[in-house]
A protein has these predicted regions:
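Radical SAM enzyme core and accessory elements
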Residues: 26-175
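Conserved, mostly hydrophobic/aromatic
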Residues: 21
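Polar, glycine-rich mid-to-C-terminal structural blocks
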Residues: 7, 15-18
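Flexible glycine/proline-rich, aromatic-decorated loop/lid segments
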Residues: 1-2
Length: 175
């Protein structure tokens, strides 16, 4: 019967420290617990003394950019994370761009790419040839029996990552 409350400070933690911990918690929720950034975050953790240190720095970056005050789209979260990566690991930002691309397409067949991503690297002609061949041979998309090449193209995605062409299949996946 007691009203819900939130601790704002204790005799051990100041208000500012509690807020800082809440910000770090939000970064862990968004970038780790969501499961949307698995590849990127696993690699990015190696750039810091500890995972906590990384999330603390990311929270400080959000605070510096006043990003906690705004609700962000999923694509917006990718853009903020990429900006953070450029600031902290500029010399490896290309590698992280590919990891972010992989994370993004593992989750969803994104139609609008974040601004920092270049084109997929797979030309229209290459994609058309792949789906035309796949329509006849069903080498990679056996579960798409009964679908024509246009339907398969809408239900999958081709992306060039690290010099290799990767096929993302969205028919059978975890949500």
């Amino acid at each position: 019967d007691r009203a819900p409350y939130e601790v704002l400070s204790t005799k051990w933690l100041t208000y500012a420290e509690v807020i800082r911990l809440k910000q770090i918690e939000e970064m862990v929720e968004v970038y780790y617990n969501s499961g949307q950034f698995c590849c990127t975050m696993a690699a990015l953790e190696q750039e810091f003394a500890s995972p906590f240190c990384m999330y603390e720095c990311l929270a400080a970056y959000y605070d510096e950019k006043n990003a906690f005050a705004v609700s962000h789209s999923r694509i917006g979260r990718y853009e903020i994370l990429y900006d953070f990566i450029v600031k902290t690991c500029k010399e490896r930002s290309e590698q992280y761009m590919e990891m972010l691309t992989l994370d993004m397409y593992l989750r969803d067949n994104v139609k609008k790419r974040p601004e920092f991503l270049r084109e997929s690297g797979v030309s229209s002609d290459e994609a058309a040839a792949f789906y035309k061949k796949e329509e006849k041979e069903r080498t990679y998309l056996k579960a798409y029996e009964g679908y024509d090449r246009r339907q398969m193209r809408k239900m999958t995605h081709l992306e060039r990552i690290d010099g290799k062409t990767v096929l993302f299949d969205y028919k059978n996946r975890d949500p």
